[in-house]
């Protein structure tokens, strides 16, 4: 359930801050605002865009979910190997590791490490080299015929859809409430670097798993 917090004092509605899952409407507002004005200072951006969210919440939502160059889909065996090698070298420096995996976020890599790789290494109980552990981990998952099919349990992702009816059904499943914009009535920029005339419609973007947190 959505929560609202007030910074107190003034009693103004502008002081209220929304907590909890982002709605489709908020996502569209944030994406279109950044497409037109750039990222800038996040606290100022949130207010200018008319979002009753903290600057931190807007930043995390954009960087981890809405940014056009965020890579979608399962982490590949090659990426798994890179994560293990760089973690052995740098430890839990997720932002630094993410720079070597284009399109992957530090949060996604951290979740993958903690829920997949680390769990497997602890379970194996072996003190082998990183290379050996990497090969064993990848081979173990490859032989199950679903190297990363189960990662969606721990990562919030979305994939495009061309079916508006399907998007509407998913909209209800993801607890967006009763907010279902008319097909094509809200347009989304394909990229912040491209012309303002290049847009995604809701049909092309949704469904999308919501980020439960700020």
UniProtKB/Swiss-Prot annotation:
Any one of the GO CC terms: nucleus
Compartments in which it is found: Nucleus
GO BP term, pick one: response to jasmonic acid
Gene3D superfamilies given in the database record: Homeodomain-like (1.10.10.60)
CDD domains xrefs: SANT (cd00167)
Keyword Cytoplasm: no
One Pfam family this sequence matches: Myb_DNA-binding
Keyword terms, alphabetized: Activator, DNA-binding, Nucleus, Repeat, Transcription, Transcription regulation
DNA-binding region per Swiss-Prot/TrEMBL record: 42-66, 94-117
Phenotype reported upon loss of the gene: No visible phenotype. Myb24 and myb57 double mutant has petals that grew to a final height parallel to the pistil. Myb21 and myb24 double mutant is partially sterile and has petals that just grew out of the sepals but ended at a lower level than the stigma. Myb21, myb24 and myb57 triple mutant has a strongly reduced fertility and an arrested growth of the petals that never grew out of the sepals. Myb24 and myb108 double mutant has a reduced fertility and a greatly reduced seed set.
Up-regulation conditions: Up-regulated by jasmonate.
Main location: nucleus
Annotated ranges, domain HTH myb-type: 14-66, 67-121
Tissue and organ expression note: Expressed specifically in flowers. Expressed in all four whorls of the flower and in the vascular tissue of stamen filament and sepals. Detected in male and female gametophytes, especially in microspores and ovules. Weakly expressed in petals and the upper part of pistils.
InterPro entries xref list: EOBI/EOBII-like_plant (IPR044676), Homeodomain-like_sf (IPR009057), Myb_dom (IPR017930), SANT/Myb (IPR001005)
GO molecular function: DNA-binding transcription factor activity; promoter-specific chromatin binding; sequence-specific DNA binding
Domain of life: Eukaryota
Assembly and interaction partners: Interacts (via N-terminus) with TIFY10A/JAZ1, TIFY5A/JAZ8 AND TIFY3A/JAZ11.
Physiological role: Transcription factor acting redundantly with MYB21 and MYB57 to control stamen filament elongation in the late developed flowers. Contributes with MYB21 to induction of MYB108 by jasmonate. Repressed at the transcript levels by DELLA proteins.
Official protein name in the record: Transcription factor MYB24
